[in-house]
A protein has these predicted regions:
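Bacterial N-terminal signal peptides that target proteins for export
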Residues: 1-9
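C-terminal motif of bacterial Sec signal peptides marking the signal peptidase cleavage site
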Residues: 19-22
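C-terminal, surface-exposed recognition/capping segments
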Residues: 26-98, 102-230
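Hydrophobic helical h-region of N-terminal Sec-dependent signal peptides
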Residues: 10-15
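Intrinsically disordered, low-complexity regions
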Residues: 2, 16-17, 223
């Protein structure tokens, strides 16, 4: 299997795994090496997909959840503490419609900047959150099936070249509650829904199907990074 690998350091803090780059200093008894494999699925764009989520140590781990455009995890996910707006119609960043911006704000940015990309901030290895188009390409060019791996439910995406990635069904977080675990997968793209910019596109799935839809940006969802080769 054609894979490109990096090593990351994971530090356990209050039970939550935090991803740091290998150059960060950590206490030896707390450090743990995590091998991230960049999987070549033979996609037309040449995009490589990571084999684990941000915050995970193995493919079956759910990892960490993030609000759209936020680079740190939180206890609660809501508009009350969202970084880029006060509510669905009170946006302060990433807004393409004056009806959704606070006091008519717009900036017409429809993709996350690197400064607001959780993959860039947490892994620092050239990875990015995938775009809506990256997820559609994955869906179009792989056979995806609902399966269970090591007791964890999710969807397995298998390419024509035989390589595959597993996305666990970790649900999503709204408020302080983690909902739909083991039944739904919900992964952010870095693409804004330009028609309703209070929402952003995510790659979701159930046992029956995978799909791309949009949700409130303040929701907590998982991130599966990609790396571009072209």
């Amino acid at each position: 299997m054609n894979k490109r690998m990096i090593l990351l350091m994971v530090v356990s803090t209050l039970g939550v795994g935090t991803i740091l780059s290998s150059c960060n200093k950590v206490e030896p008894e707390d450090e743990k090496e995590v091998e991230v494999e960049w999987v070549d699925l033979g996609l037309p764009s040449g995009v490589l997909w990571a084999n684990i989520n941000i915050g995970a140590t193995v493919p079956e781990d759910y990892g960490q959840v993030f609000g759209w455009g936020e680079t740190e995890t939180k206890v609660e996910y809501s508009w009350a503490n969202y970084a880029h707006g006060k509510d669905f119609y009170g946006l302060t960043k990433y807004c393409s419609d004056t009806n959704y911006g606070l006091d008519g704000f717009t900036d017409n940015d429809v993709n996350l900047r690197e400064e607001d990309d959780a993959a860039v901030a947490n892994w620092k290895n050239g990875s990015r959150i995938p775009t809506k188009e990256d997820c559609q390409e994955l869906k179009n060019n792989c056979d995806d099936q609902w399966t269970t791996r090591n007791g964890v439910t999710g969807r397995l995406f298998t390419a024509k070249n035989g390589n595959s990635i597993f996305l666990p069904a970790g649900g999503y977080r709204w408020g302080t509650e983690l909902d739909c675990t083991r039944r739904n997968g919900a992964y952010w793209t870095r693409s804004l829904n330009a028609n309703e910019p209070g929402g952003a596109w995510y790659f979701g799935f159930t046992e029956e199907r995978s799909y791309i839809y949009f949700a409130h940006r303040s929701y907590g969802r998982y991130v599966r990074p990609v790396k571009y080769t072209k």
